[in-house]
Amino acid sequence: MKMTYQPKNRQRKKEHGFRKRMRTLSGRNIIKRRRQKGRKKLTA
C-alpha cells in the first residue's frame, strides 16, 4: 500500500490556489478571513 499524499504542485494550485478561491463566494470569504487574521500566505 502506498502513501495517500503524493504531492503535485499543479493539482495543489488547481484545488487550493488563489484563482480557484476567487471563483466562488465562499472561497472569497476564506481569503477575506485569512486577510483579517493577518496570514502571510493566503492560499497554497
UniProtKB/Swiss-Prot annotation:
Signal peptide: none
Keyword Ribosomal protein assigned: yes
GO biological process: translation
UniProt entry keywords in alphabetical sequence: Ribonucleoprotein, Ribosomal protein
Disordered: annotated span: 1-44
UniProt keyword Ribosomal protein present: yes
A Pfam family hit: Ribosomal_L34
Family from the record: Belongs to the bacterial ribosomal protein bL34 family.
InterPro entries, sorted: Ribosomal_bL34, Ribosomal_bL34_CS
Designated name of the protein: Large ribosomal subunit protein bL34
Originating organism: Clostridium novyi (strain NT)
Single GO molecular function: structural constituent of ribosome
Basic residues: bias regions: 9-23, 30-44
Primary gene name: rpmH
A cellular-component GO term for this protein: ribosome
